[in-house]
């Protein structure tokens, strides 16, 4: 029988991973339940290792919490980079990217990922005429082919949101996801209304005033 070894990050202020063994292959970024001291906690698989420093005393992974990883490749690598760059415990960094309920060893939340459904978002059949300045700005942004921060400057009511909507439309047509960040919670209703007026389907809202269950449902569908 094959035995595989994995470095696991746990959500504690510890600047190291812990090696566990398993009889199955597990993808990195997957949540697992591991024995830790006298209790069982949630950990995240960081990597598969070939030759552990020592096999003595290695504990076995209790169970696999999810059918698939919590993070795509890009997100996973970004979180690894952030933990290294900011010299912060790797487990705490990883777990800061998942909802509170998914950080706990709870059967109800462990099975939650297996029951999620996707948001369906489609553009409404309505055309909006852009001003000359808006067209020029949108044209420049559409030429960007890689990550690049951009600043759109304008007073309130100058049409910045319409540019965001048009950019969102472009990516929705490519079956991609859109993340809109607002500077404060009080602005969410008006921004949400603009997007609901433009796009049909369900739009997820995620903020600190929601309950853990509400945030979990949105995170699972994103």
PLM region spans:
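Accessory, non-ATPase domains that flank or precede helicase/AAA+ motor cores in DNA-metabolism machines
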Residues: 1-222
